[in-house]
């Protein structure tokens, strides 16, 4: 952050924040390159870190300084080379550098907000799993929840307008327009699996998405504070970071809402958002939740000009329905405990029913994902991974162990572990079948020759941590412990099966 501060002050003016000149500085691309390497766990490697060099950057900057019109089109074929390199590489480099530049005012504003409020920057708040203790604490006391799909803008200019409050440099905004109009349309842009923009320029995509979500969340927070003096409990997870304090600190200005807000006076409303989905939960009646539903539709359509439909908002009773969030199927179920009480010669059994959050492992979608990448068939029967049969034994085992570890680590919060154990069994047997296929042997013969050492490789981190927390616990207790375990070091959802 100190280096950001130094770079930003070089081009800062009392009237405008001139960010555009930074696009011609070599250290910006060095920062983008270094940060891209640090985030290799989250992003797929598209070759940028392999091909980038100081020489390429110097050629790119010198080309931008020339007077001729510098256009980079993703639609050009791969045969078109620019100074000996693919045009897509230069486009990606510029967009990555531009995203780093535009992040500077956001980062500086967040730091100043934390310093003014003397807020403690907790690393644990960045974890994806940190939202589930919040669910366990709040949701058992609530009755209804709305599962909402966040709509997307119908015009690219809306994305540019969301940045105009912080990025006041017209040249930077025009450059952003160039990137957006060169990369197809927003409909392709929001599907990372098929979009070049989301695949090769993920930092810029994340920045635009975060700013868009932050914009409407700030207005919702502003309206909530205007209609009720009680403080809103707000938390949310972005792709890159959680900004608890920044949301509360900065309301959106210059917005007029003449509509009546009397029906929003609910002190028990809870709000959580992540990856294009948000959840509104309340203790009040379904009438209030339905009013929230139609208000959100009108709010998005009238004030943000985004396409939204009531069918994208589902209202469910927490005690009867589950909601899908962050890969878990969560629901509120009664947990009955029996207490024996004795008064003189009489003994009583008291049944105490308490609501508890249940987080279930999504076994059917996970089997579908494993079947798609050929670890099993559609029925969940393990098969060999034929594309890995040419690798070494250690490489094959390491790949399977890494996938099992990622799945076990993320879904350690499951209330019931049976489905998780089944997925781990599928992957273990798929590993054995892959090794047996490589050595042209049967599974039984291969297991007899290798012995139990192969299964020891799949000793998961969850079991190791449980042994450290409860060293005196019996082996039976360690083996059959099925309580949820939440890790506060998970900053992103890994693509656990995409290891081709």
Swiss-Prot record:
It is found in: Plastid, Chloroplast. GO terms for molecular function: RNA binding. InterPro entries: Domain_X, Maturase_MatK, Maturase_MatK_N. It comes from the Eukaryota. GO terms for biological process: mRNA processing; RNA splicing; tRNA processing. Pfam families: Intron_maturas2, MatK_N. One of its GO terms (cellular component) is chloroplast. Keywords: Chloroplast, mRNA processing, Plastid, RNA-binding, tRNA processing. Usually encoded in the trnK tRNA gene intron. Probably assists in splicing its own and other chloroplast group II introns. Belongs to the intron maturase 2 family. MatK subfamily. This is Maturase K. It comes from Fragaria vesca (Woodland strawberry).
């Amino acid at each position: 952050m100190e280096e950001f501060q130094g770079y930003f002050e070089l081009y800062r003016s009392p009237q405008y924040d001139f960010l555009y000149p930074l696009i011609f500085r070599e250290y910006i691309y060095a920062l983008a390159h270094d940060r891209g390497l640090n985030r290799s766990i989250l992003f797929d490697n598209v070759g940028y870190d392999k091909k980038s060099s100081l020489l390429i950057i110097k050629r790119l900057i010198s080309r931008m300084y020339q007077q001729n019109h510098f256009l980079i089109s993703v639609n050009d074929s791969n045969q078109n080379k620019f100074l000996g390199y693919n045009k897509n590489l230069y486009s990606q480099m510029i967009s990555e550098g531009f995203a780093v530049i535009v992040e500077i005012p956001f980062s500086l504003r967040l730091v100043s907000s934390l310093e003014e409020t003397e807020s403690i920057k907790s690393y644990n708040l960045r974890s994806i799993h940190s939202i589930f203790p919040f669910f366990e604490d709040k949701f058992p006391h609530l009755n209804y929840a709305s599962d909402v799909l966040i709509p997307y803008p119908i015009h690219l200019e809306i994305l540019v307008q969301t940045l105009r409050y912080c990025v006041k440099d017209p040249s930077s905004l025009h450059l952003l327009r160039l990137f957006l109009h060169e990369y197809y349309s927003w409909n392709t842009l929001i599907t990372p699996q098929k979009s070049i923009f989301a695949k090769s320029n993920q930092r810029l995509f994340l920045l635009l998405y975060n700013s868009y979500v932050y914009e409407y969340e700030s207005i919702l927070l502003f309206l909530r504070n205007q209609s009720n003096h009680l403080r809103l409990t707000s938390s949310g997870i972005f792709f890159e970071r959680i900004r608890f304090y920044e949301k509360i600190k900065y309301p959106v200005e210059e917005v007029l809402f003449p509509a009546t807000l009397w029906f929003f006076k609910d002190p028990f409303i809870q709000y959580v958002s992540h990856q294009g989905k948000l959840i509104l939960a309340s203790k009040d009646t379904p009438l209030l939740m339905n009013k929230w539903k139609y208000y959100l539709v009108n709010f998005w359509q009238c004030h943000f000009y985004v396409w939204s439909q009531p069918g994208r908002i589902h209202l469910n009773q927490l005690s009867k329905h589950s909601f899908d969030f962050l890969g878990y199927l969560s629901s509120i179920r009664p947990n009955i405990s029996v207490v024996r009480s004795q008064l003189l010669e009489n003994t009583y059994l008291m049944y105490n029913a308490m609501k508890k959050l249940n987080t279930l492992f999504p076994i059917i979608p996970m089997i579908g994902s494993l079947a798609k990448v050929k670890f099993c068939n559609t029925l969940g029967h393990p098969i060999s991974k034929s594309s890995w049969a040419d690798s070494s034994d250690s490489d094959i085992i390491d790949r399977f162990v890494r996938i099992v570890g990622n799945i076990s680590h993320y879904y350690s919060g499951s209330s019931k572990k049976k489905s998780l154990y089944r997925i781990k069994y599928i992957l273990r047997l798929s590993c054995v079948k892959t090794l047996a296929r490589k050595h042209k042997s049967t599974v039984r013969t291969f297991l007899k020759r290798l012995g139990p050492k192969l299964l020891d490789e799949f000793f998961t981190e969850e079991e190791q941590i449980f042994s450290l927390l409860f060293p005196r616990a019996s082996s039976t207790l360690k083996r059959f412990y099925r309580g949820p375990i939440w890790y506060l070091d998970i900053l992103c959802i890994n693509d656990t099966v995409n290891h081709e």
